[in-house]
Amino acid sequence: MNVPATRKDLMIVNMGPHHPSMHGVLRLIVTLDGEDVIDCEPILGYLHRGMEKIAENRTIIQYLPYVTRWDYLATMFTEAITVNGPEQLGNIQVPKRASYIRVIMLELSRIASHLLWLGPFMADIGAQTPFFYIFREREFIYDLFEAATGMRMMHNFFRIGGVAADLPHGWIDKCFDFCNYFFTRVVEYQKLITRNPIFLERVEGVGVVGGEEVINWGLSGPMLRASGIQWDLRQVDNYECYEEFDWEVQWQKEGDSLARYLVRIGEMMESIKIIQQALEGIPGGPYENLEIRCFGREKEPEWNDFEYRFIGKKPSPTFELPKQELYVRVEAPKGELGIFLIGDQNGFPWRWKIRPPGFINLQILPQLVKRMKLADIMTILGSIDIIMGEVDR
């Protein structure tokens, strides 16, 4: 009987791209020696839509619906960064009530994003059951979003100087009920997942990255805090009104996939604490600074000129961006989401540079998967938590 010779040459495997509703249009060219990963090359750009160039031809209000398509699972953060930049450039005061509403929406969005990370992450490593429990809780958050903003996703809720609408009657009580309910659910997840020996075998010691490495690579968010660095922009920058709440930065020192999971679980618990404090202390008053609406009003056309005769609808008042430059950032669920904004005394930004956390966190993937097994790629990639909408922009 002839035994076939053992194959000794390396094999190249393409992983992805998948549909955007699945893991996204990320393509990995993986070089394998048997099941050992020798090299991994991420190929990006399948979801590139030119978001930075679009911003240069839109006013901020016109651009707001676009930004929800970056990280389409945590849209409140992209809206927050879009209005925070012009607010800081123009020294616009945000009413206290609007700031509290923003914090509540941001933390609900953080929980929803972490839930939608946790469900598929567990399914990727072989645990299907938590997926259904997690989506049940996520639907409750989307019900709250729908009641307040009119949309379950892509909310278009933030405005320069405040928010688009006040909270409806009874919404605060419903949000309190959700917080009390969800707290018990997170405890259930920890019993179901954290102490599961099969889960621990798949994630413990997989994808380890040290504290010095994460700083050198410029990583942020749970990737940074899971490696022993206590850095959270909500405490460092004190944007909105986070300094008025009592909460703790979640961090671990191991730097592996398990540590990143524990950081995100802890962040969901802290988000509930912040929401409860904000609901209890939310002040009265206006939800939007209406004075800024009169900025940049167009001149009235003469009765006989071209605009009067041929342009039926006059342009709405726009906010003029001062001739300055500014970098503004928020702590998104996936890391530091930043905007480098250059104004030019115009309604349109001269430059709108996006710093997406997923794009920068993804850079370390080839280093983390080298000398690991093929099955560990999905564990490590899942623990990084990327959304291709913000990676490709």
Curated annotation (Swiss-Prot):
- EC numbers listed for it are 7.1.1.-
Could you provide one GO biological process annotation from this protein's UniProt record?
photosynthesis, light reaction
Keyword Iron among record annotations:
no
**Domain of life assignment:** Eukaryota
The UniProt entry, under Pfam families, shows:
Complex1_49kDa (PF00346)
GO cellular component terms, semicolon-separated: chloroplast thylakoid membrane
**Locations listed in the record:** Plastid, Chloroplast thylakoid membrane
Q: Which Gene3D superfamilies match?
A: Cytochrome-c3 Hydrogenase, chain B (1.10.645.10)
Q: In what way does this protein cross or attach to the membrane?
A: Peripheral membrane protein
Gene Ontology MF: a single term: quinone binding
Key words, A-Z: Chloroplast, Membrane, NAD, NADP, Plastid, Plastoquinone, Quinone, Thylakoid, Translocase, Transport
The record's comment on protein family reads: Belongs to the complex I 49 kDa subunit family.
Q: How does it assemble?
A: NDH is composed of at least 16 different subunits, 5 of which are encoded in the nucleus.
Instruction: State the protein's name.
Output: NAD(P)H-quinone oxidoreductase subunit H, chloroplastic
